[in-house]
Amino acid sequence: IIITVGAQQAVNIAIQVILNHGDEVYLENPGYIGMREAFKAHQCKITGIPVGKNGLDLQALPKKPKGKILCVTPTHQYPMGGIMPLANRLNILQWAAENGVWILEDDYDSEYHYEHKPIASMQGLGLQDQVIYIGSFSKVLYPALRLGYMVVPEQVIAPCVKTKNRIAGQTPMVEQETVAEFIAEGHFIRHLRKMRGLYHEKFKTIIAACEQHLENLAKPECTGAGMHIVLIFNPQLCQAGLSDMKVVEAMREHNLSASPLSTYYLDRAEEQGLVLGFANTELSLIDPHIQTLRNVMLSCMTST
């Protein structure tokens, strides 16, 4: 286990240890923008793999891959929210082992599953010699805490530590010791239990509000996990000119924020929509905010 200054540093370490400039990598599409930009900065050839309700689409994996890394968020695919079944995880591990492909497992939102028990990480299912597992405390505690970690196979421990020391040096000890004590005294588990209950209530509230106020405008993707939802715009409205970029811009005038779903795609966006975080929104404000969103979308439609 290597402690890092956030999950993004862990990604950069893995890239520098495993890849050369120009190597091909496989990323979920749509997927995490920060991951994509990290590989672009290393001049990698990026190939997108589509995702569905069960996360990454196994059938879309190349039969004879030339890429060196496959990046996955199996616990809660970002941004679409799909949760990868155990059988799919095992099949991907087998595919990677047979083809000499590294797996970069981003354990995004693993702590916040509301309607089912989390499945074991791919790193813990065997064949660990090709899996680099990345996690972070930023989302479960607070964003300003830049404290992450990576679990790496024995053969890359030394190069990963060397690379980390070269690019960033030591991770601040005060934060490490504070979090370690927080965990050891049982506060971390109590915090997760409390926040899981709170976020579950917010999750149910925002889903209900979207279904009530956004009928025929947008449909919420409901996976029972995480601190955000994805709203998929009605395709007919998009064909008529509704744009998620315009909606996000108009939302700012009402002090509301969201991310346009189209920006998470590598190339042409297959769907328009919004990535809506709810963790820092008061429970009582969720319904009125969704009503405001409805008015914003209707206004954008009349102006197209």
What residue spans do the PLM features occupy?
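Conserved core of the PLP fold type I
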Residues: I1-N99, E111-Y112, K117-I132, Y199, ...
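A non-catalytic, amphipathic alpha-helix used as a structural packing/dimerization or gating element
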Residues: P159-K162, K194-T205, P288, T292
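Conserved core segment of the aminotransferase class I/II
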Residues: L127-G197
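Conserved glycine-rich beta-strand-loop-beta hairpin in the small C-terminal domain of fold type I
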Residues: I1, G197-I207, A218-F233
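Conserved PLP-binding active-site segment of the aspartate aminotransferase-like
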Residues: V152, V230-Q239, S257-L298
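Short amphipathic alpha-helices in soluble, non-transmembrane regions
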Residues: D244-R252, H289-R294
